Amino acid sequence: MGEALRGLKRTIMCGEPRENNIGEKVTVMGWVQRKRNLGGLIFVDLRDRTGIMQIVFGEEINKEAFEKSDNVKSEYCIAVTGEIVKRQSPNNDMETGAVELKGEDIKILSESETPPIYIKEGLDASENVRLKYRYLDLRRPDMQKIFMIRHKTCKVVRDFLDENGFLEMETPILTKSTPEGARDYLVPSRNYKGMFYALPQSPQIFKQLLMVSGYDKYFQITKCFRDEDLRANRQPEFTQIDMELSFVEEDDVIDLNEKLLAKVFKEVAGIDVKLPIERMPYKIAMEKYGSDKPDLRFGMEINDLTEAVKNSEFKVFKGAIEAGGSVRAIKAENCATMGRKQIDKLQDFVKTYKAKGLAWIAYKEDEIKSPIAKFLTEEEMKAILEKMDAKVGDLILIVADKNNVVFESLGALRLHLAKELDIINKDEFRFVWITEFPLLAYNEEEGRYQAEHHPFTAIMDEDIDLLDTDPGKVRAKAYDIVLNGEELGGGSIRIHDSKLQEKMFSVLGFTKEKAWERFGFLLEAFKFGPPPHGGLAYGLDRMIMFLAGTENIKDVITFPKNQNAFCPLTEAPNVVDENQLEELGIKKIEKED
């Protein structure tokens, strides 16, 4: 049985003692990293979240403590009192390596079985084991550093927003289901049988209602929930830094958030963010990078060859252009010697993005090699090389198809090649604002328009008339902040006119009755003097991934789910008692074989 503290207080953390603490009598508490018995002396490395302290026990220091220390093992939780002294052999690899603690008294607070994972940096264990024993995984120094970074980030954000007049306010977790986009997590109501709450995908509607309420600068750091298929950087529950402001336009929100980003990245990670951050319209991002989340750390931009080959008789080019598509290409420098097998793999790669094929031109020292050369005139080949600014050693990769297929396939190929060729500077942080997004996207299956962001996004002033005549061309007052090809956050100016909001719902295929059934409380609120307003939300988890230098979102969440939205630690979700289901008015239906 472990010993009680009996009034004993920790006076210093394990990672804090330095030479200026020599001579002080202190008490440290933590976990045994390792123990070394050298006969007359026992050395214990004691660890807490701040670091490691070496403790030395000896018969001449205190016989009782020496004998007791021989019983401790790895991961025992202990408390030690003694004097800080200068180490005879300093360890320059440790922050506390100039000093050690002479152990005069020891309490074994609790014992530990042999841990199923090693408590050390750079652990090589399966993800499932790490998640099952997450409380041990979280003891590891590299994990503890991540969560100290997370804490500091939240503090810097809170301090900055407080200094800029924001109020931290909470919005409901149990709310109304308004299915549009990702699936909701539903919570059955005991009091209203057959009815359900939904967990919020974002605080969007409530923060807009707070603007109507007169709280002109709101923020919160809050949980959001989406029941969607998981990817490497997604979790079913995640954390947002959410904000909303009244009486603002796009520039106001963007300028404020540039200052916030600069402060966070500098104070938390020592990274300088060059201001102002570049802004790029969505159309340009798609045409140059094939993505609305462009990675600007390398070139290899997409070039439009449509004009250069507009009169070509080559069926692939001609067919794409006549169908309203385009012919575009990227240039891979020093890749002209790439073998046929490698190029075949690239062709297979673009086909996964619905491209019909991949044409190529290798600009070699003694020849221009290409399977499509025989279909092109000399003038067309020359025009392509000029447009691509091709030099000896370059490989030109061409896709001809519908624009969306061309952009998506070449954008993905650009990233794929950059990783394969190792031309991305991993130490660089390239921010960019993507602006002027399409307001709507047409869903062929449902035969209606859908909001690209959400149905509350304001329309660019010059495009309002297009809502009646050509909704697909309407641009939104929306903006995403992108870092190294990942969306860090996004927001927009909101519609604050009830008639325009109703019209927006109509364009989205909602009847007036359906719109009022789902969003009547918001439309009603908009009758009472709503201010112009807009905001932005960051994915905190993704931000921490950048600040901590990890590529796995599970590393930055204390108790994450696995790729199947299952928690190996608690084994959630789980089967519940029939009595609980009965109280909720729910009956299980057994599937027939």
From Swiss-Prot:
Subcellular location: Cytoplasm
EC nos: 6.1.1.12
Keyword entries, A-Z: Aminoacyl-tRNA synthetase, ATP-binding, Cytoplasm, Ligase, Nucleotide-binding, Protein biosynthesis
Region of interest (Aspartate), ranges: 204-207
Biological process according to GO: aspartyl-tRNA aminoacylation
Catalytic activity as recorded in UniProt: tRNA(Asp) + L-aspartate + ATP = L-aspartyl-tRNA(Asp) + AMP + diphosphate
GO molecular function: aspartate-tRNA ligase activity; ATP binding; catalytic activity, acting on a protein; nucleic acid binding; transferase activity
Pfam families reported in the protein's UniProt record: GAD (PF02938), tRNA-synt_2 (PF00152), tRNA_anti-codon (PF01336)
InterPro entries: Aa-tRNA-synt_II (IPR004364), aa-tRNA-synth_II (IPR006195), aa-tRNA-synth_II/BPL/LPL (IPR045864), Asp-tRNA-ligase_1 (IPR004524), Asp-tRNA-ligase_1_N (IPR047089), Asp/Asn-tRNA-synth_IIb (IPR002312), AspRS_core (IPR047090), GAD-like_sf (IPR004115)
Residues engaged in binding ATP: R226, D227, E228, Q235, E487, G539, L540, D541, R542
Disulfide bonds: none
PROSITE patterns, sorted: AA_TRNA_LIGASE_II (PS50862)
Cellular component GO terms, alphabetical: cytoplasm
Binding site for L-aspartate: E180, R226, H453, R494
Tagged with keyword Cytoplasm: yes
Record's function text: Catalyzes the attachment of L-aspartate to tRNA(Asp) in a two-step reaction: L-aspartate is first activated by ATP to form Asp-AMP and then transferred to the acceptor end of tRNA(Asp).
Quaternary state and interactors: Homodimer.
HAMAP family with a match to the protein in the record: Asp_tRNA_synth_type1 (MF_00044)
Similarity section: Belongs to the class-II aminoacyl-tRNA synthetase family. Type 1 subfamily.
Protein's name according to its UniProt entry: Aspartate--tRNA ligase
Organism: Clostridium botulinum (strain Kyoto / Type A2)
